[in-house]
């Protein structure tokens, strides 16, 4: 099986000319207003990273903690892509657009120290969240010819990827859950409690789980993901972890195995093939 997967990897990544991504700011009026003394329209922002080759497929990405991208311009994409940020050319080569997703303007509040003040589980699990994302999907379809949509979350972003997968059903082609959060934040259970007993069997579209086997973050235990995964789990091995064990440079975020993890995700999107382990 490993030699077959290797051949597939060559098909997608071998001898491909360099491709580029063009960042495009997207804003959707979600049809509601916010404000106390004066009302203003609520907008859902995203950044489309559009490949230089034609594509009809996009991966909507929700970042890890704080979970709020705070998008102001099209240049805010890199700090919000976690371990995918240095491998966007691989998506361009595969003909997959990346869409960096933010929380809507009425849920977009972050305190010093990267502490979210909004966009918690109440919003992420709601029909309103799914409706807001539908607005972006509609813009991608009508403006850029995107008809195949996948949703991915990393760490706290998996609150969105799981609930959107449930609430959008077959409106999307699949969902990817990286370093899934399954234990609520100990300082505020409104961040993470909704997925402590989440029913993964309720998801209609295909599902991929990817998790480092030595993830040490207390909110994202590997054993829990193993327990609910079937044949749809990629276990990442090896690499190196530095800094915060729940941060962007540790094994929690595929430290030292970022490229291999990215390639495995792309391979699943293109072929539905799951590599049981990578990084050995």
Language model features with spans:
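C-terminal catalytic histidine-bearing segment of alpha/beta-hydrolase fold enzymes
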Residues: 231-280
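Conserved alpha/beta-hydrolase
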Residues: 88-110
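N-terminal cap/lid segment of alpha/beta-hydrolase-fold proteins
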Residues: 19-54
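The feature captures the conserved acid-bearing segment of alpha/beta-hydrolase catalytic domains
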Residues: 174-238
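N-terminal signal peptide c-region/cleavage motif recognized by signal peptidases
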Residues: 12-14
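Alpha/beta-hydrolase active-site loop
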Residues: 83, 109-143
